[in-house]
Amino acid sequence: MIAYPCPMLKYVNYDIVFQEFPDEVTLAINLSCCPNGCIGCHSAYLRGDVGEELTWERLLALTESYAGNITCVSLMGGDNDPASVLELLARLKKHYAGKLKTGWYSGRTWEPSAESLRESLDYLKLGPYLAALGPLNSRDTNQRFYRVNPKGELEDETFRFWK
């Protein structure tokens, strides 16, 4: 757990990835200030208060710089300010009016309301990393991958990661 407040969303880096969300070419933006402190986390550097503020303008600029090359934008982390994550992704989803999907990878176990899900997300990955249970490609994992249907309901598709 971090011992200092992180009053805003900050991004450290980003990359184009092909396996975070099945069948998507994703702009994955890594957010810092992670409060979860998962032992064995592959991105422990994201626990610190580092990076630049992720504003709507910056998110839009990053997204537009990859226009035509991506099918999805995902925020990786942001558990220090889930409301801001959902707000930014809702704006992005509305701005692109179905032409670009959105996803969120959260280390928490809670689920946003159906309305928030419907307005903000196409995909949601939930759950802290627990080394004894393995990552998403392990059948024993506690983490879950969901597709958000048009009603805002979560459809568990974790099996798509299993080997």
Feature-to-residue mapping (PLM):
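N-terminal [4Fe-4S]-dependent radical SAM core
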Residues: 1-30, 35, 43-48
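Flexible, charged surface loops at secondary-structure boundaries
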Residues: 22-23, 65-69, 119
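Short cysteine-rich clusters marking metal-coordination/redox-active sites
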Residues: 38
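Core AdoMet radical
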Residues: 42-54, 68-83, 98-111, 123-148
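A short, N-terminal amphipathic alpha-helix
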Residues: 58-66
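Conserved nucleotide-cofactor-binding alpha/beta core module
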Residues: 82, 86-93
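Catalytic cores of alpha/beta
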Residues: 112-118
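Charged phosphate-binding loop/patch that engages nucleotide di/tri-phosphates or the phosphate backbone
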Residues: 149-163
